[in-house]
Amino acid sequence: MTIITPITNDPTTALLRLMAWLSPVFPVGSFSYSHGLERAVHDGLVVDAAGLQDWLQWLVRRGSGWNDAVLCAESWRCAMKGEDLHEIAELAEALAGSRERHMETMLQGGAFFAAARSWPCEIFDRLPPDCAYPVAVGAVAGGHGVPLAQALAAFLQAFCINLLQASIRLSVTGQSGVTAIMAALEPVLGETAARAALSSMEDLGSATFIADIMAMKHETQHSRLFRS
């Protein structure tokens, strides 16, 4: 059967697809993950809006957010060039630094793969159904011809928004604090998306060790709201 892939050169269509795929209501289960933030709050490392903003900006610039953006960009390029996606998928899975981080990225990736099939595309024939979330997002965006810079900016913003939503449930800040942080993070997201668009696999690397340790410690946390 021939699959017609709706490649878009229309910026409005690209925007609508990104808003749909990375919306908090897109069925990937992102609301159930805190990426270790819950443990950081529990241990007193993030106690207010200022600390939360600092936590997020370093995850994006030098932590798991950055690595995911690099993986997303490489997956986008593989999709655009018609290259095999299995190698990047295996690397992305191997980079998950803890059991819950692995669960978070793999379950979201699989859910994204399934839900995004509502937009038919040949990329689903080349993409492993069990793949990490940034690989799934990057490959699908590339398969549909969504511009890379826009895809990366939207991906990073969705990453932060999910943790901001978690911060409200954790009583770190309220809605006014969240909107202020969203506005303050715009330059960080734009700059990081631009860097990631020009990145290669050699640019992978993280320096947010405390955040990684919090994700590990969360695995044994007795009382919790989130799966990670």
Curated annotation (Swiss-Prot):
The keyword rRNA processing does not apply. It is found in: Cytoplasm. Transmembrane segments: none annotated. The keyword Lipoprotein does not apply. Keywords: Chaperone, Cytoplasm, Nickel insertion, Virulence. Its main location: cytoplasm. One of its GO terms (cellular component) is cytoplasm. One of its GO terms (molecular function) is nickel cation binding. InterPro entries: UreF, UreF_sf. Required for maturation of urease via the functional incorporation of the urease nickel metallocenter. Disruption of the ure1 gene cluster suggests that it protects brucellae during their passage through the stomach. The major route of infection in human brucellosis is oral. UreD, UreF and UreG form a complex that acts as a GTP-hydrolysis-dependent molecular chaperone, activating the urease apoprotein by helping to assemble the nickel containing metallocenter of UreC. The UreE protein probably delivers the nickel. Belongs to the UreF family. HAMAP family: UreF. This is Urease accessory protein UreF 1. It comes from Brucella abortus (strain 2308). The gene is ureF1.
